[in-house]
């Protein structure tokens, strides 16, 4: 395998409603997780250099299954967004169970990309996710999304505050924007480091 991933080869593989349906890992995997409407699908599309490979919706909570994509023998896993209030409690519980079951399963967790909106302080669910990843010693990074909505000064201030609140080392935090492409090369570098 080369020292970089050819993202132009990205394709949709499958969608799963239950973890038990997912085949065993056969290649490196990068999992993307974050609150509903954090910009997960947009960041993945920017990574792949595609507009609509990962379905983007203006309706939060649209992704309700675990979706697998593949590029150059690396799997990219789009997990359902957590914490969307306008879904029923049963649906929110199903998603929480689905995400929990996924991370409890025996898989190739080469890298977990936890996405947090840079404009807001991390929610309790964001804290819970980071605590879980840290407590279980996952290799993870935090992607701060929607950086284009803030000035550079505001970005730096918010990034510093979020790092402190989440207790995450500076080198594990990347400021990103799906609009401008900020941070995408760094994200690709971290993925290659973890998977190749």
Model-based region annotation:
Residues 64-68, 97-105:
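Conserved alpha-helical scaffold flanking the Walker A/P-loop in AAA+ ATPase domains
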Residues 82-92, 119, 148-151:
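Flexible beta-alpha connector loops of hexameric P-loop NTPases
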Residues 100-171:
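Conserved C-terminal guanine-recognition region of P-loop GTPase G domains, centered on the G4
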Residues 43, 112-113, 187:
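Hydrophobic packing within well-folded, soluble alpha/beta domains
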Residues 1-86, 196:
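Conserved G1/Walker A P-loop phosphate-binding module
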Residues 7-19, 149-196:
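Canonical P-loop GTPase G-domain recognition
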Residues 49-53, 105, 135, 193:
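Conserved amphipathic alpha-helical interaction elements at protein-protein interfaces in regulatory
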Residues 26, 52, 65, 91-95, ...:
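Helical mechanochemical/support elements of P-loop NTPase systems and associated helical scaffolds
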């Amino acid at each position: 395998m080369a020292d970089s991933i050819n993202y132009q080869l990205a394709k949709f593989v499958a969608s799963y409603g239950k973890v038990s349906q997912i085949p065993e890992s056969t290649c490196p995997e990068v999992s993307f997780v974050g609150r509903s409407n954090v910009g997960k699908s947009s960041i993945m599309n920017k990574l792949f250099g595609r507009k609509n490979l990962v379905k983007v919706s203006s309706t939060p909570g649209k992704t309700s299954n675990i979706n697998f994509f593949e590029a150059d023998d690396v799997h990219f896993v789009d997990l359902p967004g957590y914490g969307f209030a306008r879904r029923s409690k049963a649906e929110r519980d199903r998603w929480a169970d689905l995400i929990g079951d996924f991370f409890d399963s025996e898989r190739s967790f080469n890298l977990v990309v936890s996405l947090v909106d840079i404009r807001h302080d991390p929610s309790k669910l964001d804290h819970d996710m980071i605590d879980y990843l840290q407590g279980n010693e996952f290799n993870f990074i935090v992607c701060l999304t929607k950086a284009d909505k803030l000035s550079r000064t505001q970005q730096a201030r918010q990034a510093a505050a979020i790092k402190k609140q989440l207790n995450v080392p500076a080198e594990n935090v990347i400021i990103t924007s799906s609009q401008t492409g900020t941070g995408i090369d760094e994200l690709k570098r971290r993925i290659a480091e973890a998977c190749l």
